[in-house]
Amino acid sequence: MIQTKLKGTGVALITPFKEDESVDYDALMRLVDYLLQNNADFLCVLGTTAETPTLTEEEKKTIKKMVIDRVNGRIPILLGVGGNNTRAIVETLKNDDFTGVDAILSVVPYYNKPSQEGIYQHYKAISEATELPIVLYNVPGRTGVNMTAETTLRIARNFSNVIAIKEASGNITQMDDIIKNKPDNFNVISGDDGITFPLITLGAVGVISVIGNAFPREFSRMTRLALQGDFANALTIHHRFTELFDLLFVDGNPAGVKSMLNAMGMIENKLRLPLVPTRITTFEAIRKVLNELNIKC
């Protein structure tokens, strides 16, 4: 079952751009190869970190196909299919080609600020529109509304193809409530690199990671050790990343991880407006920490 495979370190893929801001498909394929070679457990394609709202429909189709073809079934593909127009998502799920997609990631509707009942009905409509496994995504810092533990559990209990939640509320009490009361066939996945270790100690099964773009091998090692109950060694790795966790998001995501990958010589440091690269002070701080870490990946 797919919920047994969406564990460990999933990587939220960035979209590399060239200097002219066109998609750098060659760099994207090199990144996918790098992640496959360095123990990423699954890939999240066309999520927040991919700057998906700034991509054209044609670019999204091309990225999806190229990544699926390159992965070729070696690890699961989680595809971002979300928005704040329920009807449009339902139409997408009914009409698009999802060959090679193992599950979809669907964010809580943003901007409209639905009630908890509205959130429930939104996911009910999505669940009924597809047989694909669904991973919920709660990130109130971006959406403007928090999906409560009660609503999450109600959805998890009522819709069998809803298999997990990517939880990025930052509310450990809420996450713990979900973990303690969830059905057996429903998992909690961290949506925040910095709390992955403590969340696994509570019963989460892994992370959809941003920093994993740069350090898949070492971050995967941390999650695997934690999942095996080797908390001492996992915590040692977690502490090595603490400063980078902060730098990743000080100027927004994916600006931080793109600066990181640029400093490593893997991509151009380009984003599409309204996002911009990190400040030079942040970039230099990232480069300094990278030099100090000297992590072999």
Model regions and ranges:
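A general structural signal for well-ordered alpha-helical segments in protein cores
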Residues: L28, K60, K64, I89, ...
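Alpha-helix N-capping/helix-start residues
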Residues: E19, Y25, E57, A149, ...
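Short secondary-structure transition/capping segments
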Residues: L55-E58, E91, Q116-I119, M147-A149, ...
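Basic, gly/Ser/Thr/Pro-rich low-complexity segments located predominantly at protein N termini
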Residues: L13, D26, T52-L55, N85-R87, ...
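Glycine-rich phosphate-binding "P-loop"
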Residues: N138-V139, N161-V162, R272-L273
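Catalytic alpha/beta core domains of metabolic enzymes, predominantly
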Residues: E128-A129, R142-F249
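Active-site beta->alpha loop and helix N-cap motifs at the rims of alpha/beta catalytic domains
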Residues: I2-G144, R154
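C-terminal alpha-helical cap/extension of soluble enzyme domains
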Residues: K5-P16, Y34, N38-A40, T49, ...
